Amino acid sequence: METTTLFPINKEVNVSAFYFKNSRSNLRSYPKQIEMDGTLVSFADGLGYLVRKGAQIVQLFDMSDGNNTYRLRHAGNEWTLIGMKAVA
């Protein structure tokens, strides 16, 4: 099984669109499109999860545009593109 390394970016991005999923009567939002350095990236699929860092809880999202996977962090009102990797 081949693994692809996450290429670190660590840059603040603007989430310009969201989509919503209703799972077990719990409505959750996911980033649908981000703007990074004037370029728009639209996502086809992804998953979100919570990570506890000390007393702080951070949302992470692994989103795919079909060619690349983007890891996003949502903390407070800030969205950060942690990194990306090519889809294997």
Provide a role label for each language-model segment.
Residues 1-88:
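N- and C-terminal low-complexity/disordered segments
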